[in-house]
Amino acid sequence: MTRTLRLAALAPVMAGLAACTTLPSDRLPPAPAPAPVITLPPTTTVPSPVPAPLPTPAPVPAPVPVPAPPPPPALPPLPPAPPPPPAPPPVSAAEVRAVALRVLPPNISERSGWADDIATAFAALSIPAQTHKVCALAAVIEQESTWQADPPVANLSKIAKAELDKKRERFGIPKAVMDLALSKTSPDGRSYQQRLDRLRTERELSMLYEDMIREIPLGAQLAGGQNPVRTGGSTQVSVAFATEQMRDKPYPWRPAGTPREEVFKRRGGLYFGATMLLDYPVSYNRMLYRFADYNAGRYSSRNAAVQSLLTQLTGQKIDPDGDLLRYKAGEPVSPRTEPSQAWRALLALQAELGVNAAQIERDLKLEKRFEFETSPTYRRLYQLADKRGLKPPREQLPDIDLNSPKISRKLTTAWFAERCEMRYRVCLARDTVSPPVPAASDPRP
């Protein structure tokens, strides 16, 4: 009974739960009513205003082409190169000696011996027996040594000591060590210090260094293994030049010493001096320029004229020192590696010269030889000068200051050349047989 009442009481609750858990029906819900169609009133389209036609642009004229500047007119073809100088004919030593005895100063010591050695040298080198040739060599001998085979040098002992002190300080050698080394007895029986105190000539200094290099280690260190005396004798030629000449040409005296020994002898000094001064062809019209070359290097006067012409043609500043290339340790350096002033100026003129850079480089390497004058670069350069109305000289004194421990005042290559020229004219005046030579020119110097 109680159970029946409980069920009856729960009946309404169960009915409510059943309503909440009704399973989904398979019947679809009724479709929604269609939305009412709203008819809009017709719209009125306002036409856009028609734009006014744009004005027709004026035609742009085509740019007027700027004509390229015309290339410089080509220089005319070069004429054939002049032939090389002919080989000199044989020379009679007797004829040279006769000329020398006419023109050498009358008061020099051993005058006959000087004439004999000049004759032997000229014959060996095929230098003609001409007054102006003999007088040219005589002028250099007089200028460099006043006719002394081993001329004294003023204050040589003082100069040599100062140079040794500089080297000692450079190597950090104590003065006491240096003094001890110089106190040793040298091969001639005197101490090195005694010989140093009494130095008078470059030959004595050269022999002192030779003994120091051989006998004491300190001497070899100070000299760097080489004798620092590089020039000497009556014509002040370099030992290196003498060495080269004795290697390349037969030396006319036998037996012969070493090149260094021969430089300090009368015969060797004038032989090497004659070689340096006269044994190469030139186109100069005055001996003055050979004297300048003797001091500055072969063909320096010709090359200085080229440098001055390049300055005129290009406006570039070029020092007329006679070197068209740069040099290191006496050897030319390629202008492509270290451009010289002349190289830069020539490159600026390439178009007008009609010569390419490779040709210019080849030609500049001939600057210490006569063949440079027959090169395309040289000949085109003077052809261009003629075209511009210039009349440049083919030779000029180089502008070089002279530097040496032996020189105590400002001297130049021009000074040296003019001093030699003065002595040369005095020598020519002593010849009463040959016709006088005008001061403005020389017969094929």
Report residues per predicted region:
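Bacterial Sec-type N-terminal signal peptides, specifically the leucine/valine-rich hydrophobic h-region
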Residues: M14-L17
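Cell-wall glycan-active module
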Residues: R3-T4, C20-P445
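Bacterial N-terminal signal peptides that target proteins for export
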Residues: M1-A9
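Secretory-pathway extracellular proteins and peptide precursors enriched for disulfide-bonded cysteines
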Residues: A11-P12, T412
